């Protein structure tokens, strides 16, 4: 082999080794990142962090027009909100965010009229749980439910 060919092979081998080392580092970094993301709690936390519910996800569920799926997601959100601990500041904050997201999803959503109507009392209790400072003495659950969903219920009652 002449020196030019030998030099070319050596350069190619060096580049392959460097590329291999680069990929090894990338894979290691991705592995460490995924382990940290999957870890339920870091060393400084005593409890796992709870993620927020994202409106875009609910829009996607709505776009399926699968009533059983939509009802199941709605029920799962209510169940999750019931489990959150308002004495934990992080969970209370997540609960407030998710409660607002749930109400935004339910507003003017033809696919949730029935489900919302069936769960108005639960939604009212959850609103009191996450927003106790809004518990006005002159409002009862019926008055608040009316202000949250009057047009929704009227439309639901008219269209069944």
Swiss-Prot record:
Transmembrane is among the record's keywords: yes
Tissue: Salivary gland (at protein level).
Knockout mutant characteristics: (Microbial infection) RNAi-mediated knockdown results in higher levels of Zika virus replication in salivary glands after infection.
GO annotation terms (biological process): regulation of defense response to virus
Chief subcellular location: membrane
Subcellular location: Membrane
Induction text: (Microbial infection) Up-regulated in salivary glands following infection with dengue virus type 2, Zika or chikungunya viruses (at protein level).
Protein name per UniProt: Salivary gland broad-spectrum antiviral protein
């Amino acid at each position: 082999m002449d020196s030019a060919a030998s030099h070319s092979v050596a350069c190619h081998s060096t580049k392959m080794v460097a590329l291999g080392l680069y990929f090894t580092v990338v894979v290691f970094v991705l592995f460490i990142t995924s382990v940290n993301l999957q870890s339920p709690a870091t060393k400084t936390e005593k409890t796992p962090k709870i993620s927020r519910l994202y409106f875009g996800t609910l829009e996607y569920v709505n776009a399926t027009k699968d009533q059983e799926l939509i009802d199941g997601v709605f029920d799962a959100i209510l169940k999750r909100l019931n489990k959150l601990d308002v004495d934990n500041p992080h969970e209370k904050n997540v609960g407030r965010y998710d409660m607002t997201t749930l109400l935004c999803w339910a507003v003017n959503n033809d696919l949730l009229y029935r489900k919302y109507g069936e769960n108005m009392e639960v939604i009212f209790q959850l609103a009191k749980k996450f927003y106790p400072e809004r518990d006005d003495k002159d409002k009862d659950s019926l008055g608040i439910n009316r202000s949250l969903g009057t047009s929704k219920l009227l439309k639901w009652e008219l269209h069944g």
